[in-house]
Amino acid sequence: MTETMTLYWRPRCPYSARLRARLRFARVPFDAVNIWEDGEAAAIVRSVNNGDELVPTVRIGDRFLSNPSFREVREALSSSS
């Protein structure tokens, strides 16, 4: 897992909280970006989700995953290395 991963999230989103917790528990390194505090990040999320601020959105290299499961993230990380 050498590819940098960014997790776009927002407060009070249970899906974001669950994915963040699973990633931390598994010790998967990632950068977490709160889209309510970072307008550029919010614009990125909208651009890959048809104008919606759908979170969690995960970026691995040039690939984006919208509301992925933990398994989907692990598979994407494995295939990117």
What are these regions (language model features)?
Residues 60-81:
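Non-catalytic, surface beta->alpha helical segment in thiol-disulfide oxidoreductase systems
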Residues 49-57:
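Structural micro-motif
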Residues 1, 42-46:
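Short secondary-structure transition/capping segments
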Residues 29-42, 52:
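Thiol-based oxidoreductase modules, predominantly thioredoxin-like and allied folds used
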Residues 1-29:
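Local sequence-structure signature of Cys/Sec-based thiol-disulfide redox active-site neighborhoods
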Residues 17, 21, 43, 75:
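Alpha-helical elements of the RecA-like P-loop NTPase motor core of helicases
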Residues 45-49, 76-77:
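Short amphipathic alpha-helix with an adjacent loop that forms part of the alpha/beta core around
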Residues 14, 37, 65:
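Glycine-/small-residue-rich active-site loops that bind phosphorylated ligands and cofactors
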